[in-house]
Amino acid sequence: MRTLFFIILFMPFISLAQKIDKVKVFLDCSWRCDADFFQREMTYIDFYKDPKTANLHVIVNGERSSNGGEIVTFRFIGINEFEGVDNTLTVDILPNTSDDSERKFYLDILKKGVYAYIIRTSDKDNV
C-alpha cells in the first residue's frame, strides 16, 4: 500500500522529467530569410524541412512600413513537447539597412525567440 502511495504521489514529477534533447525548428519563412545563414550560425539547434518532426514552428512574415523600411514578425509556436509555449517578436528594419545587417537582425531575433525553448531542454548548458 505504501509503495502504491509513493508511485501515485510522484507520478506527476516523473512525467515532468521527460527529456527534451534539442530544439528542432521548422522555419516557415515567406520574407527574405537566409535559412542557410541561420543554420550555419545556430548549430546548437536542428532545422527540419518537415513540420511533423519539429518541436518548434517559426513563421516569419514581413511587410513594407510607411517609411520605406520593413516590419518583420517572427511567430514561435511550440509543437509536441513545447505545446502551448508560443511567442511573437517583431523587428523594424530601416529603409537604408544593408542586406548583411538585415540578415543579422533576423538572426538576432531568431536567437532570442529560440532561447525560450532552449532553456527547457537538456542541451541548455551547451549553448
Where would I find each of the regions flagged by the language model?
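Short helix C-cap/helix-to-loop transition motifs enriched in small/turn-promoting residues
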Residues: 7, 51-52, 67-68, 79-85, ...
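Pro/Ala/Gly-rich low-complexity, hydrophilic intrinsically disordered segments
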Residues: 101-127
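Generic hydrophobic secondary-structure signal
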Residues: 5-9, 25, 38, 42-45, ...
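Bacterial Sec-dependent N-terminal signal peptides
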Residues: 1-20
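Amphipathic beta-strand/beta-sheet edge segments enriched in Tyr/Trp
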Residues: 56-106
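Start-of-domain marker
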Residues: 18-67
